[in-house]
A protein has these predicted regions:
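Adenylate-forming AMP-binding core of the ANL superfamily, especially NRPS adenylation
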Residues: 10-12, 153, 186-187, 191-235, ...
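Gly/Ser/Thr-rich phosphate-binding loop
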Residues: 119-124, 133-191, 204-206
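Conserved AMP-binding/adenylation subdomain of ANL enzymes
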Residues: 54-71, 79-121, 135
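Conserved AMP-binding A3 loop
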Residues: 31-55, 186
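Conserved ATP-binding/catalytic segment of the ANL
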Residues: 220-284
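Conserved structural elements of the adenylate-forming
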Residues: 13-14, 18, 46-67, 75, ...
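Conserved S/T- and glycine-rich ATP-binding loop of Class I adenylate-forming
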Residues: 30, 36-39, 72, 78, ...
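Conserved pre-ATP/AMP-binding loop-to-beta segment of ANL
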Residues: 2-35, 42, 65-71
């Protein structure tokens, strides 16, 4: 059901009109353009192709198996890649049901709806997960098989609260809009607390040294899920493909990370938030 609607577009053309005219869509055609927040400059238009999105779905499915028996509860905004790609498109591709709720802020209502719907998969951020846990009754969340956190650091107290109160282990992942969005994720079999999991399949990475940081460096990645590029600010309609000193296709995440011997990634912070003090860089 729809509880809130700010606008509704009604087309005169039947759905089959759009289906017929999209049959010739090329795999590398633009599927969606999502804009970054602009927290470190101007917002950037991230161009993702159909191939990018489908590749990331295949990568994530190796860790989280979306299937037709699942019901996904998604209250995240669809103008963000976490809410759109992970919370909507991936479950749709898996054939499951999806319940979209307009706001993640209703801490009392959302757990009740999860119970009523029998939801099995839930996407949220640390902030919201902590809020739900303070209001939800233990039985409200007993249908959930997967609780997946992203978009911000998952705190230890949030993880412990969910485990002790509901017996649910939160799986933390890591992604960026430019990667459609998932780069790494923990799963039920391979899960290391404090990390964002291991790199998804078919991705390469290297750690770029940063002056003043001995343990860790910049994470640079490449794979079929990496964006086509950014919309050019200078040349209308053109796309600036990702590239580093190693060539085209490599994307510098801007995140300082440590990768352990088992391949689990720990995020130390954004590179631009590290200050050099006494010859060493420390997070601010």
């Amino acid at each position: 059901f729809i509880t809130k609607l700010s606008a509704l577009y009604m087309s005169k053309n039947p759905a089959k009109y759009y289906s017929k005219n999209n049959l010739n869509t090329k795999p590398n055609a633009k599927a969606v353009i999502l804009f970054t927040s602009g927290s470190e400059g101007y917002p950037k238009g991230v161009v993702l192709s159909h191939t990018n999105i489908l590749a990331n779905y295949a990568q994530v499915r190796c860790h989280i198996n979306f299937n037709p028996t699942d019901t996904v509860f998604n209250c995240l905004p669809l103008f963000h890649s976490f809410g759109l790609n992970a919370g909507l498109l991936m479950p749709l591709l898996g054939g499951g049901k999806i319940f979209l709720y307009p706001s993640p802020l209703n801490y009392r209502v959302i757990p009740e709806l999860i119970y009523e719907l029998g939801a099995t998969i839930f996407f949220a951020t640390n902030t919201f997960l902590k809020g739900y846990a303070h209001y939800a009754h233990p039985y409200d969340l007993n249908t959930l098989n997967y609780v997946i956190a992203g978009a911000e650091k998952l705190h230890v107290d949030t993880m412990e609260l969910w485990m002790h109160k509901y017996g649910l282990r939160i799986l933390q992942g890591y992604g960026v809009t430019e990667a459609s969005p998932v780069i790494s994720v923990n799963n039920k079999m391979l899960n290391k607390s404090g990390t964002v999991g291991r790199l998804v399949s078919d991705m390469e990475y290297y750690i770029k040294p940063v002056d003043g940081i001995e343990n860790g460096g910049l994470l640079v990645v490449r794979g079929p899920n990496i964006m086509q590029g950014y919309l050019s600010h200078h040349k209308l309609g053109q796309i600036e493909a990702p590239a580093t000193e190693r060539g085209l296709g490599w994307y510098d995440t801007g995140d300082i990370v440590v990768v352990d011997d088992d391949g689990f990634i720990t995020i130390l912070g954004r590179a631009k938030r590290f200050a050099k003090v006494g010859g060493e860089r420390t997070g601010r």
